[in-house]
């Protein structure tokens, strides 16, 4: 819900939401407002399988977002160049540009979803459980990629996750919510080392320790 409010898909019923100094408490009512917000804030969904149009080639996925949010009017050749530039940024070489989503693995699809978001050159990317559907080894690759992109492009992330190990790896600051209320917040490393709220302590205690193995039944 918080993510949907930030991108303008939900109206705030109490309190305020501010993005880059601008009040975003009201849902975007007009197409122009939605485009302005989308240029500022892009969204990467949890499911890399349903978030892409299965009939649209990867190059077209990226180019459509480039075309929608470009401040100039790039021609076909320039759009192709920019699309490949964005795909290069997420580690997908030229051979992927003509492929369909069904030809890609889950990790590759999520790279495409990240590239689609970056095509708008946003200030903020909302990642809603963006690695939860991926294998652990692929999760690590995507998290490392996101860290590199953040450093290179100076983009901020709102990373929504229930996995504290993932949160610890990707975030600088952490907010803990319980039943829609903020119950804890602060520097991620400090908060995980010394949680103050009972709910945060319970979350931390639920994380398996090193060498953990499931019990046999």
Language model: regions and residue ranges:
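Helix-to-loop junction immediately C-terminal to a conserved catalytic motif
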Residues: 7
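ABC ATPase NBD coupling module
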Residues: 23-42, 60, 68, 76, ...
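Conserved ABC ATPase "signature" region
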Residues: 77-95, 204-205
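Conserved ABC ATPase signature
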Residues: 100-104, 108
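Conserved catalytic motifs of ABC-family nucleotide-binding domains
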Residues: 121
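A short, surface-exposed alpha-helical micro-motif characterized by mixed small hydrophobic
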Residues: 167-169
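ABC ATPase "signature
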Residues: 182-186
